[in-house]
Amino acid sequence: MSISFSELVAKTLLDLEVKVVFGIVGIPVIEICEAIQASGIRFVGFRNEQSAAYAATAYGYLTQRPGVCVVVGGPGVVHAMAGVFNSKTNRWPLLLLAGSSETFQQNCGAFQELDQVSYLSPHTKLAVRPPSPKMVVDSIRRAYRVSMTGTPGTCYVDLPANYIESTVDDFPKDPLPPIPSSPKCAPDPTQLQKAAYYLKNAKAPLLVVGKGAAYACAEKQLLEFVEHTGIPFLPSPMGKGLLPESHPLNVSSARSAALRNADVVLLAGARLNWIFQYGLPPKWSPNAKFIQIDTNAETLGNNAADLDLAIWADVGLTIDCLFKLVQTWKYSVGISTPYLRTLNETRSKNEKKALESRKSSIPLQMNYALYVVNEELQSLSLKSKRNITWVSEGANTMDRGRQLLEVTHPRGRLDAGTMSTMGVGMGYAIASAFAHSSDKIVVVEGDSAFGFSAMELETAIRNQLDLLVIVINNNGVYHGLDTDAYETLRDNHQLPTTALGTSIRYDQICEACGGKGFFVKNEEDLRSSLRKAWQTSSVSLINVMVDPEAARKLTFAWMSSTKVKPKL
C-alpha cells in the first residue's frame, strides 16, 4: 500500500489533532493544501503570506498549540518571514511548512529557488528538510513538539517539489498519538523564598501581569494571589482580562503613579522592555526591586531586573507556590497604606478627567468614538451573554484603545505585541474566529493600519466568519488632514508624510467583497451601526470618521520623551 507525499503530510497533521491550517496555495504546495482539506482539516486560504503567518502565530497564542502555516517557496517564505519574526519576538508557537525547489536542481536557478533552511535557521528554533520523503512524519512531529516546548517559537519544515510529487510505501498506517502539551517547569525553592521575603517586607508592592501569564493560562492562580494578599496589579496591554478590569486593586488608571512609587515589583510573564520603560528611572523608582517570572532564561536579568531575584519557571506554577509561602501575610486587605491612598487618589482623578472629556461632537473625537464603541458593545455583550475578543491595531487607535476598550476575559485582547507590528489585525481576527469561535470578534483599527491587510476582508467573508471590523478613520498615519487642506497641499505636492486620502470608503471595500458596510460621522449613526453589526453573523465594517487632529502633538504612554525622534 502506498500513499502520496501530500496525503502523508495531511495524515501527520491530522494525527497531531491540527484543526485548521492557514496559508496560500501555489506550486508546489497546492497538492498538500488539497490533501489537508480532504483529510477534514480546515484550510484557510489568505491573500497574502504575511497575514496567513500572522494568523497562525495568533492561533498558537490563543490555543497554546502551534499554529500551522503552509506557503510556497522563495518569495512566499520571504513574505511569511514577518510571521516568523512575530512568533519569535512574542514567543508564540508556529509551525511553518513551505514548498521548495527540487533537490536535484539545487544551485541551478530553479523556480523560486531559495536555501530556505539556511534562510530561516537564525530565526527559528528548528529548520529542517526531511532526509527522504518518508521521514517527513518524523520531521513534522519533531518540529511541532519543539515549537511549543520551553520558550515557544517557530519551527520550519522544508518540502521539496520532488518529494511532493512522490509516493511513500513505508509509513505508519495506524494513527500516531498526539503530542502532549509542553511540560511546565517548577520554580527553584531558593528563589521562591527570596521572592516571598521581599514581598513581605515591601512598603509599596506591585504585580505586573504580562501576556506571558496569559499564554500560561495563569488567571486562576493570579486572582487567588491578588485577592488574598491585597497587592495592587497592573496588566500589560495583552495581560488585560486575566484579572477583572473592575477589580479595586487594578491600578491601570494610575499607571504612572504605580510605576513611580513601587518598591518591589513582581513581574508575572511581563518583560522590562519598552512597554514598561525598561524598569528604569524616571518612570520607575531608582530603588525598585524586580522579581521576574519567565520561561525564557535569556530574558531574566534584562535592563533593571536583578538576576538574583529571577525565577525561571512557569508563571502559574510559580504564583501557586509563592501563594503558599505568603498565605499568612496580607499587604492591604482591610487596610489602607500611604501607597494605596496615592494610587486610589490618582486613579479617581484620572477617571474623573476621562469622564469629563467624553463629549459628543462633529467631527467625532477619537477618544469619544472609542468610548461609544466600548459602551455600546459591552451592553450588547452582556445582553447576549457573548464575550468580545478584541483585536486592536494602529498607533493612536491602539494606544487609546488600551485604556478605553474593556477586556472581560483572559486572552480577550490581541494587539500589535512586543514589536508593535502593523499589519497583524485581520490575520489575528481570522485566527480568533477559529480559536474563540463562540466570541464576537471585534477588530478596532486605525485607517493606516487597516491598509496593511484590508484585502483579508475577502478571506473572512469567503470563510463565512463572524467579524465586526471598526476602522477609526482620521485620514492619516497618526493624524491626517481635512478635505480642504488635503486638496490644497496635494495640488502643491506638499502633502505631509502622515497624510492619507480623505474619507476613504473602506466600508465599500467590505461591501464589494460581500460583507456589510457602514459609513458614520456622528454618535447616533455609530451607535445604530454597532447594534446592527452585532446582530450580523458575517463580516461587517464600520468606517468611523473622526477628527484628523492635524495640530495634535504626538505623544504615547510608552514614550520616554514627548518628542518623536527621527530614525537615523
Swiss-Prot record:
Primary location group: cytoplasm
Annotated Gene Ontology cellular component terms: cytosol; peroxisomal matrix; peroxisome
Entry's EC annotation: 4.1.2.63
Subcellular location: Cytoplasm; Peroxisome matrix
Cofactors, names only: Mg(2+); thiamine diphosphate
Reaction(s) this enzyme catalyzes, per UniProt: an (R)-2-hydroxy-long-chain-fatty acyl-CoA = a long-chain fatty aldehyde + formyl-CoA; a 2-hydroxy-3-methyl fatty acyl-CoA = a 2-methyl-branched fatty aldehyde + formyl-CoA
Gene3D superfamilies attached to this UniProt entry: 3.40.50.970, TPP-binding domain
Binding residues annotated for Mg(2+), in chain numbering: D447, N474
Record key words, sorted: Cytoplasm, Lyase, Magnesium, Metal-binding, Peroxisome, Thiamine pyrophosphate
GO molecular function: 2-hydroxyacyl-CoA lyase activity; magnesium ion binding; thiamine pyrophosphate binding
One record GO biological process: fatty acid alpha-oxidation
Pfam families for this protein: TPP_enzyme_C, TPP_enzyme_M, TPP_enzyme_N
Record remark on domains: Peroxisomal targeting signal 1 (PTS1) is a tripeptide located at the C-terminus of more than 95% of all peroxisomal matrix proteins. The prototypical PTS1 is the terminal tripeptide SKL (serine-lysine-leucine) but the consensus of PTS1 is defined as [S/A/H/C/E/P/Q/V] [K/R/H/Q] [L/F]. However, this description of the PTS1 consensus must probably be expanded beyond the terminal tripeptide.
Cited function: Catalyzes a carbon-carbon cleavage reaction; cleaves a 2-hydroxy-3-methylacyl-CoA into formyl-CoA and a 2-methyl-branched fatty aldehyde.
Family: Belongs to the TPP enzyme family.
Protein name (Swiss-Prot/TrEMBL): 2-hydroxyacyl-CoA lyase
